[in-house]
Amino acid sequence: MTDKRKDSSGKLLYCSFCGKSQHEVKKLIAGPSVYICDECVDLCVDIIREEIKELAPHHERSELPTPHEIRKHLDDYVIGQELAKKVLAVAVYNHYKRLRNGDKADGVELGKSNILLIGPTGSGKTLLAETLARYLDVPFTMADATTLTEAGYVGEDVENIIQKLLQKCDYDVQKAQRGIVYIDEIDKITRKSENPSITRDVSGEGVQQALLKLVEGTVASVPPQGGRKHPQQEFLQVDTSKILFICGGAFAGLDKVVAQRLNTHSGIGFGAEVKSQNEKASEGELLAQVEPEDLIKFGLIPEFIGRLPVVATLGELNEDALIQILQEPKNALTKQYQALFKLEGVDLEFRKDALTAIAKKAMSRKTGARGLRSIVEAALLDTMYDLPSFENAEKVVIDENVINGKSEPLIIYSQPENQASGE
């Protein structure tokens, strides 16, 4: 085929499909007695791509992993948080079992098991959600609750969350409807006051109201891929009742709300049991006893709490847990940096006192596991900068002093060949 603007007689040419003249299009491709323009070619490609997508089988695990198998996989990547992993494994298993059986079992309608994760920063909330989605091979997206506002106000509309999920699976609606959505910082959209206000709270209670239907289950209308380019296309209809929503937040101060309730319910007077300072419950122990009434007092509206029936609490990670996180998971931080150095042909060794120093530093910063990478990165920055220029470097050793900025990493060099042979 050839690209032609005019035939041999100089006659004006037209596209045989859309009828546009050669002056209205960029290219006109000639075939045996027919012509097709570049716009029609693009349209044909889009049609074929859509048909291939519809005919392609939806990849889904043939067998749903059991709660034990889900928990075991989480153990490979997440240290500690045993109760939270158990709760998540059961909730996720029940959710996908419900989807496979068409929302009903023996005529009984099965409700959604959306999840609320409560735990301090860096305790593993996001990692748990990401690991679950990766293991189950389902689309996953994250949203920050602090950026959301009610429709019509400056900020991100809640239905943008579904748009992000669709983007992750190339706008395959069926695949998106089996996905997992993690909404972080959910504690930041609490009501500003327990008393109703005459002023509109568009980023607090207003967002909770907007999320209600989405989390419970509704048919969301989402603009198709390239919606602005093709405004005539119909909106995609996504059933959110099949999407698993996991909401997470630190809920700073919630432990005090729980403690207040427990103290109120405990006896007072001569017969009351008096607890010493040492017997007082820790923050983690208090959060493990959280009730819906505590969350309402904290600022979540009752209707929203009702849409998150499964509640899992995560404890603050101690020093030993942080040391484990540094070296035990399959994608442990020390293993990642060792693999990075190995690409340069150099071994990297972290001594035990270095791991302890990293954990202590993260504890003092109160950043949990999230702060570990920045500490290691800062300690290795100069070495990683110089390493590609080093000759005969064989090993880099990191100890406590390196982490605390008191000394440089120890670099061990291999002996040059001419020295080794005695020349």
UniProtKB/Swiss-Prot annotation:
Gene3D superfamilies: 1.10.8.60, ClpX chaperone, C4-type zinc finger domain, P-loop containing nucleotide triphosphate hydrolases. ATP binds at residues 120-127. Residues 2-56 form the ClpX-type ZB domain. GO terms for molecular function: ATP binding; ATP hydrolysis activity; ATP-dependent protein folding chaperone; protein dimerization activity; unfolded protein binding; zinc ion binding. It comes from the Bacteria. Component of the ClpX-ClpP complex. Forms a hexameric ring that, in the presence of ATP, binds to fourteen ClpP subunits assembled into a disk-like structure with a central cavity, resembling the structure of eukaryotic proteasomes. Belongs to the ClpX chaperone family. This is ATP-dependent Clp protease ATP-binding subunit ClpX. It comes from Proteus mirabilis (strain HI4320). The lineage of its organism: Bacteria, Pseudomonadati, Pseudomonadota, Gammaproteobacteria, Enterobacterales. The gene is clpX.
